[in-house]
Amino acid sequence: MSAPAIQITGLTKSFGDVHALRGVDMTIKQGEFFGLLGPNGAGKTTTINIVTGLVFRDEGSTEVFGKDTVKDFRFTRSKIGIAAQEFSVDWFFPIEKLLYFQAGYYGLTQEQAKPKIDDLFERLGLDKKRES
């Protein structure tokens, strides 16, 4: 039996004091048509952003074709595409981590991205803001 296309278990995410997701469980089988519907603020975008790796989950697990979406980020990005309405990131990410994430979208390893990111911080005079 093949792994589900998407498997979400106990997914939890908070933004400060706001609980966006609490214990979400969901299985989407391979080949299944699926719609994620709900009112504004229900957590649809947060769920999608976590599955696609744009936002880190607080608790729980998210898998795409049996691969953890955090540990196997590149695999996930190769299997799922998303066309966002607006640029969306976890605003609690340090700037440096966000830049490494963005570099990954262009196929750069952390080792390849490091000198480019270091150069950006130096040229922009933001070296002290890496962890902001």
Model-predicted segments: where are they?
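Walker A (P-loop) phosphate-binding loop of ABC-type ATPase nucleotide-binding domains
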Residues: 39-43
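Helix-to-loop junction immediately C-terminal to a conserved catalytic motif
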Residues: 52
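Conserved ABC ATPase "signature" region
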Residues: 100, 104, 111-129
